[in-house]
Amino acid sequence: MALFSVPTPVTTILLDIEGTTTPITFVKDVLFPYIKENIKKYLLEHWQEKECQEDITQLQKQAEKDSHIDGFVPIPSAISDNETENMIQAVVDNVYWQMSLDRKTTALKQLQGHMWRSAYITGQLKGEVYEDVVPSIRQWRELGFKLYIYSSGSVEAQKLLFGFSIEGNLLKLLDGHFDTTVGHKVESKSYRNIADSIRCSPENILFLTDVVKDMPLYLVTQESYPEAVIRGVCC
């Protein structure tokens, strides 16, 4: 992480995950491939469970919203047990399609989070973090800063990554988590929602991310809102 001085008004640090606390390669080369390689097996094993069916329902609703998009993959409803296999394949195809477009819909992230949970609990996955992350977080906590995570990955997926990390359980070092349910990272309203949720003035929040395009225009033009620090580059 680039060396920088935390602005005086800041009391809260908001951390992105991919490319900020965790190598992009972990997400691209470990987490995403795990989904593609195991989704059909997971659906077959958990199909009758309430949680899995809720995930499917959310994916179907998202598919309906996506019907206007070129190349979208529909997810039909299974009328009989004989059609279950076809429906499972439709879900697999839809997930593949969304992932090929690097989409970050809440429905997709929810299913992915549940799949990763199973893998973390069984020891198939360990969350990766950069070697400077834990020392930095500990230092910030000692200085009295509040620390939150804001990522496009679901809150559950975030907690799994930090709860089952290569550095052990890091959840005790964090004060909370936010995902796309508060809005997307490119939307200024999302940051106001977070500020309201933690009862903190926006000017007291520092957002750390590695992706400039994730910062709404006001983050880099308005001094009264959170600033941003890019891994490797201070701005």
UniProtKB/Swiss-Prot annotation:
<comment type="subunit">
    <text>Monomer.</text>
</comment>
<dbReference type="InterPro" id="IPR027511">
    <property type="entry name" value="ENOPH1_eukaryotes"/>
</dbReference>
<comment type="function">
    <text>Bifunctional enzyme that catalyzes the enolization of 2,3-diketo-5-methylthiopentyl-1-phosphate (DK-MTP-1-P) into the intermediate 2-hydroxy-3-keto-5-methylthiopentenyl-1-phosphate (HK-MTPenyl-1-P), which is then dephosphorylated to form the acireductone 1,2-dihydroxy-3-keto-5-methylthiopentene (DHK-MTPene).</text>
</comment>
<protein>
    <recommendedName>
        <fullName>Enolase-phosphatase E1</fullName>
        <ecNumber>3.1.3.77</ecNumber>
    </recommendedName>
</protein>
<dbReference type="GO" id="GO:0000287">
    <property type="term" value="F:magnesium ion binding"/>
</dbReference>
<dbReference type="GO" id="GO:0019509">
    <property type="term" value="P:L-methionine salvage from methylthioadenosine"/>
</dbReference>
<dbReference type="InterPro" id="IPR036412">
    <property type="entry name" value="HAD-like_sf"/>
</dbReference>
<keyword id="KW-0479">Metal-binding</keyword>
<keyword id="KW-0378">Hydrolase</keyword>
<comment type="pathway">
    <text>Amino-acid biosynthesis; L-methionine biosynthesis via salvage pathway; L-methionine from S-methyl-5-thio-alpha-D-ribose 1-phosphate: step 4/6.</text>
</comment>
<dbReference type="InterPro" id="IPR023943">
    <property type="entry name" value="Enolase-ppase_E1"/>
</dbReference>
<feature type="binding site">
    <location>
        <begin position="151"/>
        <end position="152"/>
    </location>
    <ligand>
        <name>substrate</name>
    </ligand>
</feature>
<keyword id="KW-0963">Cytoplasm</keyword>
<dbReference type="InterPro" id="IPR023214">
    <property type="entry name" value="HAD_sf"/>
</dbReference>
<feature type="binding site">
    <location>
        <position position="210"/>
    </location>
    <ligand>
        <name>Mg(2+)</name>
    </ligand>
</feature>
<feature type="binding site">
    <location>
        <position position="185"/>
    </location>
    <ligand>
        <name>substrate</name>
    </ligand>
</feature>
<dbReference type="GO" id="GO:0005634">
    <property type="term" value="C:nucleus"/>
</dbReference>
<dbReference type="GO" id="GO:0043874">
    <property type="term" value="F:acireductone synthase activity"/>
</dbReference>
<comment type="pathway">
    <text>Amino-acid biosynthesis; L-methionine biosynthesis via salvage pathway; L-methionine from S-methyl-5-thio-alpha-D-ribose 1-phosphate: step 3/6.</text>
</comment>
<dbReference type="Pfam" id="PF00702">
    <property type="entry name" value="Hydrolase"/>
</dbReference>
<keyword id="KW-0028">Amino-acid biosynthesis</keyword>
<dbReference type="GO" id="GO:0005737">
    <property type="term" value="C:cytoplasm"/>
</dbReference>
<feature type="binding site">
    <location>
        <position position="16"/>
    </location>
    <ligand>
        <name>Mg(2+)</name>
    </ligand>
</feature>
<keyword id="KW-0460">Magnesium</keyword>
<keyword id="KW-0539">Nucleus</keyword>
<feature type="binding site">
    <location>
        <position position="18"/>
    </location>
    <ligand>
        <name>Mg(2+)</name>
    </ligand>
</feature>
<keyword id="KW-0486">Methionine biosynthesis</keyword>
<comment type="similarity">
    <text>Belongs to the HAD-like hydrolase superfamily. MasA/MtnC family.</text>
</comment>
